[in-house]
Amino acid sequence: MLGIWTLLPLVLTSVVRLLSKCVNAQVTDISSKGFELRKIVTTIETQNLEGLHHEGQFCRNPCPPGERKARDCTVNEDEPDCVPCQEGKEYTDKGHFSSKCRRCRLCDEGHGLEVEINCTRTQNTKCRCKPNFFCNSAVCEHCDPCTKCEHGIIEECTLTSNTKCKEEDSRSDLPWLCLLLLLIPPIVYVVIKKACRKHRKENQGPHESTTLNPETAINLSDVDLSKYITTIAGAMTLSQVKDFVRKNGVSEAKIDEIKNDNVQDTAEQKVQLLRNWYQLHGKKDACDTLIKGLKTADLCTLAEKIHAVILKDITSDTENSNFRNEIQSLV
């Protein structure tokens, strides 16, 4: 009898454990079924938002594309009362149970779009990019303007790709550029040479156009320029005088000294600068140095004028001297 009372608690514990397992299994099964039910309900609700399933009473068939349900079915499995969508403004492209049509899409010109296919009751509007616009995405909500090329086009703009432009420093122009750079120096040289020759001819006096015979030939290398300094200074600007004397030995300190001594008289500055140069250089070859220096500074016209003045004066003196000599020989 004592053994029975000892085994009874063990039996009761085993029974409780078995009952607990059964209850847990049922709860788990119920939870799993509840989850599946919620999933089905969610799917139905989502589809109802698209109008693919029944609203209100269950109609037997959906409204065809291009129409909508005018009113709910009053009896389950009844045929729906469908009416057409508004042409050009609304559409439905599949069978449905909804009482509303979808609104047609608008092609916004401000976003570079235009209508490719108009909206019908069974098809939404189809948009495309306007001319000179493109869109390279799968769904085009807007189009971008095509790039305008300044230096030539490699590929034209299309509806799905932008223009491909040539670069500014295209290598195709390099040979022409090199040829141009090679031709410029000789052309400039010829132009300058012709200009100097033209000025020389325009300023040449009648006495210069004839060739002097050995008896009347004049050597300008030993001409005394002191009496021509004022005339030469009057034919030149102050900057021209400064450039000439600076390149021919007059120091900057001396140039500044002459400037400070004659601040208000630029004419006197030119005369003093040329006198100072002449004193430094000396009489011999001074005339040739002056003429060559002016030509080197691209002052061909000025050089020819000074040369003509000196030559005319010397020629006149020579003729007078010859005339006097002839008179004396006759006496």
From Swiss-Prot:
Region (Interaction with HIPK3) residue spans: 209-313
Glycosylation sites: N118
Residues annotated with Phosphoserine modification: S221
Region (Interaction with CALM): 226-250
Ranges of residues in domain Death: 226-310
Annotated TNFR-Cys repeat ranges: 47-83, 84-127, 128-166
Its membrane topology: Single-pass type I membrane protein
Transmembrane segments: 172-192
GO biological process: activation-induced cell death of T cells; extrinsic apoptotic signaling pathway in absence of ligand; immune response; motor neuron apoptotic process; necroptotic signaling pathway; negative regulation of apoptotic process; regulation of stress-activated MAPK cascade
UniProt free text on domains: Contains a death domain involved in the binding of FADD, and maybe to other cytosolic adapter proteins.
Assembly with partners or alone: Component of the death-induced signaling complex (DISC) composed of cell surface receptor FAS/CD95, adapter protein FADD and the CASP8 protease; recruitment of CASP8 to the complex is required for processing of CASP8 into the p18 and p10 subunits. Interacts directly (via DED domain) with NOL3 (via CARD domain); inhibits death-inducing signaling complex (DISC) assembly by inhibiting the increase in FAS-FADD binding induced by FAS activation. Binds DAXX. Interacts with HIPK3. Part of a complex containing HIPK3 and FADD. Binds RIPK1 and FAIM2. Interacts with BABAM2 and FEM1B.
Name of the protein in its database record: Tumor necrosis factor receptor superfamily member 6
Originating organism: Macaca fascicularis (Crab-eating macaque)
